[in-house]
């Protein structure tokens, strides 16, 4: 079954391990920290005075890939979990539900004709392409703060759940880094488990 976890306060030890092992994780920017050890232990062991936020706040863990997303508060964390689960089947024996699509089938986007510059050295907005091609407002990005040269997330195409993987030429020209490779591998494993097809956009 799909497992989604929210950190809503200070999380340490085994609960922290369960959180990072989830298929999707989110933490509250206002109240959450994920810690191996708290400030008192760090002060005794290392002689350094650090706050819980400095040791394990959202800025730390969305950047290092420990959690997928950060949300403003508890309510937004739970909203992110609901959205993630809306793309998922109940278990691996089932396919994700297909929802009614109210995106007009005749919709076109003239901006796509010239959104990719003729000058290959010039960056462009891959997010704009993704959002235009897929069902409107359906793209749910995962791990935006980590491995930023790669874009991963879930979306819908004609109501069907799809995985999205693209390289982002606004960061390191879309090149594959160690963090980007780890992020992409983890996302492909998620899609392999729950079977949504993957749509890939590649910038060379």
Located regions from the model:
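Non-catalytic terminal/interface segments that mediate subunit docking, oligomerization
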Residues: 121-204
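Short low-complexity stretches enriched in small and charged residues
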Residues: 21, 26-27, 115-124, 155-157
């Amino acid at each position: 079954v799909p497992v989604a976890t929210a950190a809503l306060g200070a999380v340490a030890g085994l609960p922290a391990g369960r959180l990072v092992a989830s298929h999707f994780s989110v933490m509250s920017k206002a109240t959450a920290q994920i810690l191996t050890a708290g400030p008192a232990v760090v002060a005794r062991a290392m002689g350094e005075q650090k706050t819980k936020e400095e040791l394990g706040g959202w800025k730390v863990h969305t950047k290092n890939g420990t959690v997928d997303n950060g949300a403003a508060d508890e309510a937004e964390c739970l909203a992110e979990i609901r959205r993630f689960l809306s793309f998922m089947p109940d278990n691996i024996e089932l396919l994700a539900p297909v929802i009614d699509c109210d995106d007009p089938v005749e919709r076109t986007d003239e901006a796509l004709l010239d959104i990719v510059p003729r000058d290959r050295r010039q960056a462009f907005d891959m997010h704009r392409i993704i959002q235009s091609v897929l069902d409107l407002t359906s793209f749910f990005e995962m791990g935006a703060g980590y491995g930023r040269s790669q874009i991963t997330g879930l979306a819908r195409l004609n109501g069907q759940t799809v995985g999205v993987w693209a390289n982002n030429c606004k960061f390191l020209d879309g090149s594959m880094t160690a963090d980007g490779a780890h992020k992409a591998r983890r996302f492909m494993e998620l899609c392999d488990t729950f079977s949504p097809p993957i749509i890939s956009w590649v910038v060379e």
